Amino acid sequence: MSPIFINITLAFTISLLGMLVYRSHLMASLLCLEGMMMSLFITIALMASNTHSPLINIMPITLLVFAACETAVGLALLVSISNTYGLDYIHNLNLLQC
């Protein structure tokens, strides 16, 4: 296994651990999720460049589109929760009430 893949795997693991540790703060969770998406993007882009298959070349772009949609929805939720409750600490929020 090359050092690049080891570093990308380490970045994904650190982002995953950060997601587990900071799951009660929405902003920190979104940042960790973006770190996971970027490490997945780099991994898929490297695999696409190594295989030279025309079908796999669209996968990194598709992942970036999904990451952008996830970011937009996450930031919209963050703004909505921050405007309503004044904080991003989602552990104390009861989001099921009307």
From Swiss-Prot:
It is a multi-pass membrane protein. The chain crosses the membrane at residues 1-21, 26-46, 61-81. GO terms for molecular function: NADH dehydrogenase (ubiquinone) activity. Keywords: Electron transport, Membrane, Mitochondrion, Mitochondrion inner membrane, NAD, Respiratory chain, Translocase, Transmembrane, Transmembrane helix, Transport, Ubiquinone. It catalyses: a ubiquinone + NADH + 5 H(+)(in) = a ubiquinol + NAD(+) + 4 H(+)(out). It is found in: Mitochondrion inner membrane. Its main location: mitochondrion. Its EC number is 7.1.1.2. InterPro entries: NADH_UbQ_OxRdtase_chain4L/K, NUOK/Mnh_C1-like. The keyword Ligase does not apply. GO terms for biological process: ATP synthesis coupled electron transport. PANTHER family: NADH-UBIQUINONE OXIDOREDUCTASE CHAIN 4L, NADH-UBIQUINONE OXIDOREDUCTASE SUBUNIT ND4L. Core subunit of the mitochondrial membrane respiratory chain NADH dehydrogenase (Complex I) which catalyzes electron transfer from NADH through the respiratory chain, using ubiquinone as an electron acceptor. Part of the enzyme membrane arm which is embedded in the lipid bilayer and involved in proton translocation. Core subunit of respiratory chain NADH dehydrogenase (Complex I) which is composed of 45 different subunits. Belongs to the complex I subunit 4L family. This is NADH-ubiquinone oxidoreductase chain 4L. It comes from Chlorocebus aethiops. The lineage of its organism: Eukaryota, Metazoa, Chordata, Craniata, Vertebrata. The gene is MT-ND4L.
